[in-house]
UniProtKB/Swiss-Prot annotation:
Species name: Danio rerio
Descriptive protein name: Tudor domain-containing protein 1
GO CC terms of this entry: cytoplasm; P granule; pi-body
Positions of Zn(2+) 2 binding: C94, C97, H115, C119
Positions bound to Zn(2+) 1: C83, C86, C103, C107
InterPro entries in UniProt: SNase_OB-fold_sf, Tudor, Tudor_domain_containing, Tudor_TDRD1_rpt1, Tudor_TDRD1_rpt2, Tudor_TDRD1_rpt3, Znf_MYND
One GO BP: germ cell development
Zinc finger (MYND-type): 83-119
PROSITE patterns referenced in this protein's UniProt entry, alphabetically: TUDOR (PS50304), ZF_MYND_1 (PS01360), ZF_MYND_2 (PS50865)
Domain of life from the UniProt record: Eukaryota
Pfam families in the cross-refs: TUDOR (PF00567), zf-MYND (PF01753)
Gene: tdrd1
Subcellular location: Cytoplasm
């Protein structure tokens, strides 16, 4: 083991340090005592004798200030620090926050449990350039002397930027007489104004900087890019104002620009200080300028040009005329008359062919240079090509087809810069290996021939100089008569080889597509005109010789704009983010890249006349105030990208009329059209041969373009002949397709599976949805969708097709691939917060169960929350038999209709077969509201059930076909299969009407009131079915008149206080008192009542164990339902624990025990408020 990483043999002490206000914290005048003080304050070990010794040392070194230790004590006698734990005098303090004091390690250890939540690292002290006047403290000897107490600043220094400085007023057309002090090129140079006021101001601020920072000592400061700091110049070691341009944290250096002198350099971080607020905020003295009206001929200023201009104007006093003000006043476009030449600088640049006027297009290279290179290469090729094999039939193979959004693992094969990367798919490694073997065999059987002279642009086999292996290569040019420049099309690199190292290639070897994928990192750009060598080296270190996850975000100039992530790193980070954070690149919008037209391919599409008017358009929007809207999904690409439209009859009618006008416009439009990326147009959809509004996404080759139909969201590639220009009148209606993504979920395995897509499509496609906006990002609207009363995200989570966003996936506790006999038992005790949440239900594999032809189809079991309940069909009022009460949003009644006895008997038989073949039950933790199989304690048989509550060891269930409840151990719970849920439960899930006004968490008083109301005679009226629950209106029968329970509950919610009814029967009042006495229990009162009946619990409606299903007939006779009576007795006492009323609400809590404690605290607070209010 490396001793540098060896663990210490002794456990380190908690962070304690001596307080700065103690007797030994006075900062001495000499340098040596400061060192001793720092060691003392940083000490983590409490040693009494050692501290005393150090006190003596400090006293001796501070002899010029303190006459004796007693003097120091008397001086600081006014400051007393108390231990944060025991309140005794504490002379030690936490080294982390440097604020909390303690008297010993023992007290600090006891207080650490609470203190760690507020203990934050202290901010390094910054020495102020102007110390505050300190209060004079008399000496103990009474001589009248004073001792100033130094005040240290713990506050974070304020960062200062250019915007915080005063603006220099320079008007357009004004003349400035100045001297050029620094010149990089004609597009960037600095001048100093020649005036006495500027010279005096510059001298003054320079003196302020030297006075503030020359003698200061501070810790290393980490500036931000764009911040103004005080920087020590390397040549004269003086301090000047500078702007931070880049920060290299690894090398502890930063690139700075001296704003008062115009030059720049790289300095160490310890030579940088935060700029004090006391430094005058005068504008930069160096005015940044550029020569107006010109730009470089070849796209960048050449070295020859810079030298000529430097000799012409550098260090000379000239009169500059301000022709334009750019970059919010930070850059002045100027020109000056050079007296020695008799012409302006701009004219000189144009005359010397260094620059051209701004309105002339720039060419990256002159036509003469390009022509010379092509001519030389062609002459070298044709010189000895007469009658030889030019390999003209071997054309380059097609490139690999990649689409935006594709993601794959790749290996970088060649890299020149972040804008020029070539990589190979890792999944094609075996194909490439086989290709290399075929090339080796082919070339070994093909002899070299003097007759073979391939033409530029053709493909052949080339022997690579480094490993002497054969590869497919494209002939780029002839550098001489017998040497050729080739590019290896499967790897991206190129080299110059001799002609005798080339071989002709067969058609079979050209069948495979080009394996090198040209890429560029999306979203970043170089800090200068070109990428620096340091940036390229860092990128090679990050991506070369390792597996990289590549995702295609767009396309530009024939390259894929990608993001790259090294999945082997910990933590995983984007290469783009790393380059930006390390100061090697700047952020650039990806959308800008996508919207730029490809000049190489746009010319292949017929040109149209330039558009005279500037088109303007808008897109449909969704409210972001929590309002639910009706949506219809029109295009589904994935759960992270789908398009929908806000369903409105008015907009639908308008869209129909606009489509008719669009059709007439396209039939009459005859002018050719040139597609431009990011511009709208009319496109013909080949699916139905109709015209629609579209947006150009990409200009492809062969006269085609890729468009997105803006009212529906789908995209396709169309011919240029099927594109028409659009008019402004057809753009008045906002684009109807709204890009959305499903919020709150993410893929289980990193990518969305096909099953999740199909399930999402089944829930949402082609039907109205209820949606609410949760967030807005660059991906569109993050939506919460409801389909048929179900939250789509909750359904996907409960079916194990998605997981909550940001949740760390726990390893499965039961391996599905193992036989049932090999499943290990879970521990007998398991904290509730380790249970699988509603998003990840447990699944049990049943592959190990023996099957016979008459057995059920075996499928994996789970604890589904979205089990389907019966939909009532009652036309009038009826008297419900309440089985269990959770809240007004969720309660269960027995099926008031006829029971299908034969179907129920078959289900019971299937349940018995399924459960008998399961392994020894594990202590699974289903969530409240989930369906399951439960073993009845009366006869040890298995029945279908619904979980009401769960603790660490037990579950409170209701038997879904009989209505009685009991508490069973978790070992008596098994998952249930989808086949066993086909037959509907005999308990019916219900809710009061008006659910949209109900809260997520119900007040305890309202739950108590609702339980009391249901304890008497109740009549119900069916109002509808929302896809999840039957909506009922309940009426309480009370002698003279009926009372609407729905109105009572809504009124109680609105008033916020509960007034008990004076007409309640006496037994109800007693039950209410009994409820108040039982509020201290951590479980519901329903459960408490059932525990009193646990000794006399009957099995689920079974009178004879030999006939397990015969008692099902008792559902037809209400008077014989003893279990219903038990249920009614239980429901007369309401739940004191707020149950989760939907699967979506359950996702927000992962610890039931903590939730119960919080509910209990809320009850006590409400009780206290009521008592105070009554007084």
């Amino acid at each position: 083991m490396n001793p540098a990483f060896a663990q210490p043999m002794m456990r380190p002490n908690l962070p304690l340090r001596r307080p700065a206000t103690g007797p030994s914290s006075l900062s001495p005048r000499g340098p040596a005592p400061a060192i001793y003080e720092e060691r003392l304050l940083a000490s983590d070990v409490l040693d009494g004798p050692k501290i005393d010794t150090m006190r003596k040392d400090i006293s001796q070194n501070c002899g010029d200030v303190l006459s004796s230790p007693q003097t120091a004590v008397s001086m600081m006698g006014q400051v007393v620090k108390l231990c944060n734990y025991c309140s005794h005098q504490g002379n030690l303090r936490c080294t982390r926050c440097k604020k909390t004091c303690y008297c010993s390690v023992a007290c600090q250890t006891q207080d650490w449990i609470a203190h760690r939540h507020v203990c934050k690292p202290s901010i390094p002290e910054v020495t102020s350039e102007k110390p505050k006047e300190s209060k004079a403290v008399p000496y103990a000897n009474g001589l009248g002397g004073t001792q100033a107490k130094e005040i240290s600043v713990d506050a974070q220094p304020k960062r200062i930027y250019r915007r915080d400085l005063h603006k220099k007023v320079v008007s357009k057309g004004s003349e400035i007489k100045g001297t050029v002090i620094d010149l990089r090129n004609p597009g960037m140079f600095s001048i100093h104004c020649q005036c006495e006021e500027m010279i005096e101001s510059l001298k003054k601020i320079t003196q302020q900087l030297q006075k503030t920072y020359c003698s200061s000592f501070a810790q290393e400061y980490k500036p931000e890019v764009g911040e103004l700091c005080a920087v020590k110049f390397s040549l004269d070691q003086n301090w000047y104002r500078a702007e931070i341009q880049a920060v290299d944290v690894a090398r502890k250096t930063a690139g700075v620009f001296y704003i008062d002198f115009g030059n720049e350099e790289n300095v160490a971080l310890d030579h940088i200080r935060p700029l004090s607020e006391n430094i005058d905020a005068v504008p930069p003295f160096a005015l940044q300028c550029c020569i107006a009206g010109v730009k470089p001929l070849t796209g960048s200023w050449t070295g020859e040009c810079c030298i000529a201009v430097r000799q012409l104007i550098a260090g000379k006093s000239l009169t500059f005329t301000v022709l334009d003000i750019m970059n919010d006043g930070d850059l002045l476009a100027v020109d000056s008359l050079v007296s020695t030449l008799g012409k302006h600088v701009s004219t000189f640049l144009i005359d010397q062919s260094y620059a051209i006027k701004e309105d002339v297009p720039v060419k990256t290279q002159t036509e003469h240079s390009i022509s010379s290179l092509l001519t030389a290469s062609f002459e070298n090729f044709k010189r000895f090509s007469g009658g030889k094999n030019e390999n003209s039939e071997a054309r380059p193979p097609e490139p690999l087809t990649q689409g935006v959004g594709d993601s794959f693992t790749a290996v970088v094969t060649h890299l020149q810069s972040p804008s020029e990367i070539l990589c190979q798919k890792l999944e094609n490694a075996s194909i490439i290996q086989q290709l290399q073997m075929n090339l080796r065999v082919h070339c070994s059987n093909t002899a070299a021939s003097d007759d073979f002279r391939p033409a530029p642009g053709t493909v052949c086999c080339s022997l690579f100089s480094e490993d002497n292996q054969w590869y497919r290569a494209k002939v780029l040019a002839y550098s001489s008569e017998d040497r050729v420049c080739v590019g290896y099309i499967d790897f991206g690199n190129s080299e110059e080889v001799e002609l005798n190292r080339l071989r002709p290639i067969s058609k079979e070897l050209l069948a495979l597509a080009t394996q090198a994928i040209p890429c560029s990192l999306a979203g970043i750009k170089s800090l200068t005109d070109t990428w620096s060598d340091e940036a390229v080296l860092m990128l090679k270190h990050l991506v070369c010789n390792r597996f990289i996850r590549v995702e295609i975000l767009g396309k530009k100039d024939g390259r894929a704009l990608v993001s790259m992530i090294d999945e082997s790193s910990d933590p995983q980070a984007s290469v783009t983010e790393l380059l930006v954070n390390m100061g090697f690149a700047a952020i650039e919008s990806v959308e800008t890249k996508k919207n730029e037209p490809d000049p190489a391919t746009s010319t292949e599409i017929p040109l149209s006349q330039p558009v005279v008017e500037k088109l303007e358009w808008t897109g449909a929007e969704l409210p972001f105030d929590g309002q639910k809207v009706e949506l219809v999904i029109s295009t589904l690409k994935s759960l992270d990208e789908f398009y929908c439209y806000n369903y409105s009859k008015t907009d639908e009618h308008t869209l129909t009329e606009m489509s008719f006008e669009l059709m007439k416009h396209c039939e009459s439009e005859r002018a050719p059209f040139t597609p431009i990326v990011g511009e709208p147009c009319c496109a013909l959809f080949t699916g139905d041969a109709r015209w629609y509004r579209a947006m150009v996404l990409e200009v492809c080759g062969e006269g085609k373009a890729r468009v997105c139909f803006v009212d529906y969201g789908n995209s396709c590639e169309v011919d240029a002949a099927h594109l028409k220009a659009i008019t402004q009148s057809l753009l008045k209606l906002p684009f109807q397709a709204i890009r959305c993504w499903l919020a709150g979920v993410e893929p289980v395995e990193g990518q969305w599976k096909k099953e999740a897509m199909l399930r999402f499509q089944a829930l949402c496609a082609g039907q109205p949805l209820s949606g609410k906006v949760l967030s807005i990002t660059e991906k569109g609207y993050g939506m919460e969708l409801e389909s048929a009363g179900q939250t789509v995200a909750s359904v996907l989570i409960s079916e194990h097709l998605a997981k909550p966003y940001g949740q760390v996936r726990q390893p499965p506790q039961i391996q599905p691939a193992k036989p049932a006999s090999q499943i290990e038992d879970l521990p007998s005790l398991k904290p509730i917060d380790q249970n699988p949440s509603v998003e990840e239900p447990l699944k049990v594999s049943s592959k190990g169960a023996a099957t016979t032809p008459e057995d059920l189809p075996v499928s994996s079991g789970c604890f589904p929350l979205n089990w389907k309940t019966l939909e009532l069909s009652c036309s009038g009022t009826f008297q419900p038999r309440v089985a269990a009460v959770i809240s007004p949003s969720l309660f269960y009644i027995m099926n008031p209709g006829q029971v299908n006895v034969e179907g129920l008997k078959a289900v019971m038989t299937d349940v018995a077969k399924y459960c008998s073949k399961q392994p020894v039950p594990n202590q699974c933790h289903p969530l409240p509201g989930a369906s399951c199989c439960a073993q009845f304690s009366g006869d040890k048989n298995w029945y279908r059930a619904v979980v009401l509550e769960v603790t660490t060891k037990h579950a409170h269930v209701i038997y879904s076909d009989y209505g009685n409840m009991e508490t069973v151990p978790l070992s008596s719970i098994l998952p249930i299969t989808k086949e066993l849920l086909q037959h509907p439960f005999q308990i019916v899930r219900c809710a009061l009407t008006g659910k949209e006004h109900f809260p997520v968490v119900w007040p305890t008083e309202v739950l108590e009131l609702f339980g009391i109301q249901l304890s008497g005679g109740v009549l119900a009226s069916f109002q509808g079915f929302d896809g999840t629950s039957n909506l009922l209106t309940l009426t309480q029968q009370s002698g003279q008149s009926d009372r609407d329970i729905n109105s009572i509950i809504l009124g109680a919610l609105q008033k916020g206080q509960i007034k008990p009814s004076s007409k309640l029967p006496a037994n109800v009042n007693e039950e209410k008192k009994d409820v108040e006495q039982k509020q201290t229990q951590p479980i519901s009162s329903n459960k408490a009542v059932e525990q009193t009946l646990s000794t006399n619990v009957e099995k689920p409606a079974l009178d004879d164990q030999t006939l397990p299903l015969s008692v099902s007939l008792k559902h037809e006779e209400p008077e014989n339902m003893s279990k219903t009576k038990t249920a009614e007795e239980c429901t007369s006492t309401p739940d004191t624990v707020s149950s989760i009323e939907s699967s979506h609400a359950a996702q927000s809590c992962c610890c039931q025990e903590l939730k119960q404690k919080m509910d209990r605290i809320e009850e006590l607070v409400l009780l206290l408020v009521k008592q105070v209010g009554s007084r």
